[in-house]
């Protein structure tokens, strides 16, 4: 049965829409270059997202490490924006031309008066993130992702933004479940699905490891050229986040974290891997990593001798080699593992782009599951 489903998805590859993504310098890298990273990190907190009417809280959404962005258009005629395709949130928003925050002066803004298809919904919105906040109002307009057209799409227009000044994108396009969205709005993926934009309600990510170009997000099917072997399917453990159950995390044959099972979010909105601080510290001890300016570093000479970190998910091992989880920046070799999720109600981990670069990922809304396979 698994093979029949796989063949069905591959057969749809001729009908899918593939949108290029570009790898940008992250805010973490920018802050590090300006010696401002420590102050920023001290202000961050991580908790699971929740929704309350027109106020949406995503404290776990920290765009400090967002690297991959793509272009969409809004309005008639189209106005183009660079956005994060984010599996960790469900809202679409861009800055409004009347926004007065400094962040809006360095990003593209939407002008409602220049769009003949724009309609103001009027409801005020507030979205809290771990790394900032936006306030504004809801509008409706035609949104295009490549050849996909989402008519009368609800989206947020920010009038105030805090914490988004140096980020390499204008707005965010959320791909999580509707339960994470602003009340009485339909996320763009669901709107496209309901209008028959694709026959299979799936999207997938291929994230290139090193080059700025070559990464893609695809809608409506799967292109098998981007992965090796077969897709292993993992059921989603709850229906708001793209969250799965993980069996354990091990190094050198010894379970180092998640010994009794835990939850993990697959998150295209961050590059890092986050977990409870105590468990992340255990992993760093096995690396002989030391804390330096709020980040863990190892000897660059020792990287090739480090063992893989193995994530066992649904009975399948997903190893992460040291060349993937250690990043060399100038003469320093830094771990991508970060603590801070212990404030969540579950023993939650966040597997960001560092993990997803190694594994092609398919997000299947209809069957509420995620497929993983080694990326080419």
UniProtKB/Swiss-Prot annotation:
Q: Which Gene3D superfamilies match?
A: 6.10.140.60, Acid Proteases
Question: Keyword Protein transport, does the record have it?
Answer: no
The processes (GO biological process) annotated in the record are: proteolysis
Point out the signal peptide segment.
1-15
Q: Which InterPro entries match?
A: Aspartic_peptidase_A1 (IPR001461), Aspartic_peptidase_AS (IPR001969), Aspartic_peptidase_N (IPR012848), PEPTIDASE_A1 (IPR033121), Peptidase_aspartic_dom_sf (IPR021109)
Location of the protein in the cell: Secreted, Extracellular space
Q: Name one GO cellular component term.
A: extracellular region
Q: What is this protein called?
A: Pregnancy-associated glycoprotein 2
């Amino acid at each position: 049965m698994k093979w029949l489903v796989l063949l069905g998805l591959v057969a749809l590859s001729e009908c899918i829409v593939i949108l290029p993504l570009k790898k940008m310098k992250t805010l973490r890298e920018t802050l590090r270059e300006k010696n401002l990273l420590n102050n920023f990190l001290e202000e961050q907190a991580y908790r699971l997202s929740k929704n309350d009417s027109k106020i949406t809280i995503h404290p776990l959404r920290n765009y400090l490490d967002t690297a991959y962005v793509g272009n969409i258009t809004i309005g008639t005629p189209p106005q183009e924006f660079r956005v994060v395709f984010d599996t960790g949130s469900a809202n679409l928003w861009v800055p409004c031309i009347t926004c007065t925050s400094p962040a809006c002066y360095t990003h593209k803004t939407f002008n409602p008066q220049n769009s003949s298809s724009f309609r103001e919904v009027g409801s005020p919105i507030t979205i809290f993130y771990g790394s900032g906040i936006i306030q504004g109002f809801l509008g409706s307009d035609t949104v295009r992702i490549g050849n996909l057209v989402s008519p009368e799409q609800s989206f947020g227009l920010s009038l105030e933004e805090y914490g988004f000044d140096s980020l390499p994108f204008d707005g965010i396009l959320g791909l999580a479940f509707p339960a994470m969205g602003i009340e009485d709005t339909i996320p763009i993926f669901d709107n496209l699905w309901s209008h028959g934009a694709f026959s299979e309600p799936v999207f997938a990510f291929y994230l290139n490891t090193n080059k700025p170009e070559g990464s893609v997000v695809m809608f409506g099917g799967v292109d098998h050229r981007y992965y090796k072997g077969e897709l292993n399917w993992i059921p989603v453990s709850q229906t708001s986040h793209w969250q799965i159950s993980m069996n354990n995390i091990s190094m050198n044959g010894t379970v180092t974290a998640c010994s009794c099972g835990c939850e993990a979010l697959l998150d295209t909105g961050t590059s890092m891997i986050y977990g409870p601080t105590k468990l992340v510290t255990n992993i760093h001890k096995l690396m002989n990593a030391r804390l330096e300016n709020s980040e863990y570093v190892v000897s660059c000479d020792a990287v090739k001798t480090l063992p893989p970190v193995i994530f066992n998910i649904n009975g399948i091992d997903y190893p992460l080699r040291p060349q993937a989880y250690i990043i060399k920046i100038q003469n320093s070799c830094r771990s991508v593992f970060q603590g801070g999720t212990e404030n969540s109600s579950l023993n939650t981990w966040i597997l960001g782009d560092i993990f997803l670069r190694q594994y092609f990922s398919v997000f299947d809304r209809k069957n509420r599951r995620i497929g993983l396979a080694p990326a080419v």
